[in-house]
Amino acid sequence: RIVIPVHFAGQSCDMQRIHALSKKYGFRIIEDASHAVGGRYQGQPVGNCRYSDITIFSFHPVKIITTAEGGVALTNDAALAARMASLRSHGITRDSSLMQSPSDGPWYYQQLELGFNYRMTDMQAALGCSQIKRLDDYVARRHRIAQRYDSKLAQLDVTLPHQSSDSHSALHLYPVQVDPGKRLQVFTALREAGIGVNVHYIPVHRQPYYEALGFRAGQFPNAERYYAGAISLPMFPTLTETDQDTVIRALEAALR
């Protein structure tokens, strides 16, 4: 059994408590930290796997840093690392100590299992390496933008994103909650004003694939309640104060 906590919007889940539950109920943990590269939990970088078996990061173009596509999986378990390395490259090994029969020569390899072609190119890796040097600056800039949103939206009829005291969010997103009855009106008005708002996310169990597996509306009421009023405001390091003020004025007008 595996539990996959998602560090939504860049803020870490309470991994210490989830880890305690894993010991009680006997499940493994894979952290989905796609939003949280550069974030911290209990003062330590997200991805250190103190409370999990594996942590995954996404480097999709809209994430905090990018390699154009792809990502990484981190672990402190040598056996898991070796298995992931094998699966990444078609399940092939050139390590004679892992082969099931003697090697024919230095050219020899064996496919031990049916893996995947998940190899990142050198060019993609170089792009990621160049960006990771600026990761702390990117996250710091996102925090300044979020603090400004917090201050200027405090008097509006919106619920601001919760920030946990033991998590330093990477602030991949800045999602607010509006009156569900006004969400479509607000979203449409902001889009018509040229502001790239979005909704993160449609609950997974409402997608046809999962409905075909037996999931139904009402089974996850908190997710559905959150979705009903969710709108994500623009959040990226190069967002200027002038543009941010435009977003805030448009949101204020749309809420009237």
For the regions a language model picked out, list residue spans one by one.
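Short hydrophobic "helix-edge" motifs at membrane interfaces and signal-peptide entry regions
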Residues: 22-23, 48-51, 66-68, 224-225
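Acidic active-site catalytic centers that drive phospho-/nucleotidyl reactions
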Residues: 31-32, 69, 122, 234
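Active-site PLP attachment segment
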Residues: 50-94
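PLP-dependent aminotransferase class I/II
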Residues: 2-6, 11-19, 24, 40, ...
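Conserved PLP phosphate-binding loop immediately N-terminal to the Schiff-base lysine helix
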Residues: 2-18, 27-58, 64
